[in-house]
Structure formats: C-alpha cells, structure tokens
Amino acid sequence: MQNEAGEYVDLYIPRKCSTSNRIIHAKDHASIQINLAIVDEQSGRATGETKPYAICGAIRRMGESDDCITRLAKDDGYIPKDF
C-alpha cells in the first residue's frame, strides 16, 4: 500500500476480541484466533468456509475463553441452545 507521498507502507488492521470487543494490540501474545469449520448438515463434510473467533489475552488469563467460545457458537447457531 502507498501513502500520499508515494512511499510503500504496511497496512496494519487490528483485530477485535469477539467477546469483549477490545482491540487486540500487537504485543498481546496471549491472544488466540480459532477458526471453526462450517459443516454441511446433509453430508457431514466441511464446506471450506470458516467462522473466526478472536479471544484476547485478558479473557484467557481469567480462564473464561472456553465459556466465551461456547456462548459465541450458540449465538451463531453452531451449537444447539440447550447444550
């Protein structure tokens, strides 16, 4: 990407935590991104599409990442509501 002066610069797009909507900064080495594969209900095979979930290090430090992933997957309809 080029700026107005014609110099090549890198484009940094920060990620946001899927649970807390905090910006995950570049030095947050405890943050993770999990891609859940979307599965066809008829054949039971992965379609090649994924749904990414990003969890920041603060949520992981509290030990809440597994509950957050489960809640997000329920909200998106990947896990039944009565799970």
Swiss-Prot record:
The keyword Ribosomal protein applies. Keywords: Cytoplasm, Endoplasmic reticulum, Ribonucleoprotein, Ribosomal protein. GO terms for biological process: endonucleolytic cleavage in ITS1 to separate SSU-rRNA from 5.8S rRNA and LSU-rRNA from tricistronic rRNA transcript (SSU-rRNA, 5.8S rRNA, LSU-rRNA); endonucleolytic cleavage to generate mature 3'-end of SSU-rRNA from (SSU-rRNA, 5.8S rRNA, LSU-rRNA); translation. Its main location: cytoplasm. One of its GO terms (cellular component) is cytosolic small ribosomal subunit. Gene3D superfamilies: 3.30.1230.20. The keyword Ribonucleoprotein applies. InterPro entries: Ribosomal_eS21 (IPR001931), Ribosomal_eS21_CS (IPR018279), Ribosomal_eS21_sf (IPR038579). It is found in: Cytoplasm, Cytosol; Cytoplasm; Rough endoplasmic reticulum. One of its GO terms (molecular function) is structural constituent of ribosome. PROSITE patterns: RIBOSOMAL_S21E. Component of the 40S small ribosomal subunit. Belongs to the eukaryotic ribosomal protein eS21 family. This is Small ribosomal subunit protein eS21. It comes from Ixodes scapularis (Black-legged tick). The lineage of its organism: Eukaryota, Metazoa, Ecdysozoa, Arthropoda, Chelicerata. The gene is RpS21.
